[in-house]
Regions:
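Conserved small-residue
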Residues: 1-127, 131-238, 246-248, 255, ...
Length: 300
């Protein structure tokens, strides 16, 4: 694929909402956008990204500073941040957003193979909606984001490619940290607009310091990308809030006809030091944490 810069996520409409699609800039500049579209996995991944942008733009010290900041203050900070880091949000280019050009040697998968509602390989097509369709750039961006944290376990990832020297990978890729084994239940505070939602879910420095993130808020990966699965940057992501919001559980590279995908950073889960996303529901009061699993047959 041509590695010229194109499709900047700050400017291009790619985020599904009721009225169509909007850009990252519009999330924080428009007060009339009330909610996200897409599947549950897409909504979770998008809300985590919006929180990551918000935390990077402005993490208040405490509740009092959070209240003074308000929706408008956070929106202004996020717009300034997106302008400052505009070059980091190109979906295609020499340094594509949340991607690893070094995995180009991994096998090329069809995009449909990473979509849970699409039948590929020897899976039977029962409904027309399950047939694989070409994806546009907006859909590819969304698929990439979902696979950072909500990827499924299995053998579709290429185990033969590792970016960290000497690292050996198992036959099956681990499920993303936002899912774990059975599908974690996520809960978010929802505002009257998407930018108010971002403010309501914004954590303070005091809250982060009291929780389970050894390295605090941390640095978002689009500012400093790891060069391997277990280097210093990757290790820091396993210990920070940013690493839970954008965990890079898969190392991917988008191509015109498909996607290169290998297992990325293996994050500890709730049984390994109690590490969880800030949005998951569970009981950590006992010695062994107990998580609530998503059940479509039950209403949370």
């Amino acid at each position: 694929m041509d590695r010229k810069r194109r499709f900047n996520l700050t400017d291009e409409p790619w985020i599904p909402v009721a009225s169509g699609r909007i850009s990252l800039r519009e999330v924080f500049s428009r007060a009339d956008v009330t909610g996200l579209g897409g599947s549950p996995l897409e909504k979770i991944a998008l809300l985590k990204l919006l929180q990551a942008v918000a935390q990077a733009a402005r993490t208040p010290r405490d509740d009092a500073e959070w209240a003074r900041l308000g929706t408008e203050g956070l929106a202004e900070a996020c717009l300034a941040y997106l302008e400052k880091w505009h070059e980091a949000f190109w979906l295609y280019g020499p340094a594509p957003f949340l991607q690893f050009p070094a995995v180009a040697r991994a096998k090329l998968l069809s995009y449909g193979s990473l979509l849970p509602d699409v039948a590929t390989g020897n899976t039977s097509v029962l409904f027309q909606s399950q047939k694989e369709q070409p994806l546009d750039d907006a859909q590819k961006a969304l698929l990439l984001l979902v696979n950072m944290s909500c990827c499924f376990s299995g053998k579709k990832v290429d185990k033969s490619v590792a970016l960290s020297p000497g690292l050996t990978k198992g036959a099956s890729g681990k499920a993303g940290p936002a899912l774990c084994a059975l599908g974690l239940l996520h809960s978010f505070l929802m505002g009257r607009s998407l930018r108010e939602t971002a403010w309501l879910n914004l954590l303070t420095q005091k809250q982060v310091a009291q929780d389970i993130y050894q390295d605090g808020v941390g640095v978002p990966p689009w500012e400093v990308m790891p060069q391997g699965e277990v280097d210093d940057v990757a290790t820091a992501l396993t210990r920070s809030l940013m690493g839970r919001l954008v965990p890079l559980a898969r190392f991917c590279l988008l191509e015109e006809e498909g996607i290169h995908c290998v297992e990325g950073i293996r994050h500890p889960d709730y049984l390994q030091g109690g590490m969880v996303d800030p949005s998951v529901t569970g009981d950590r009061s006992a010695k062994k944490p107990r998580m609530i699993w998503a059940d479509p047959q039950k209403r949370p």
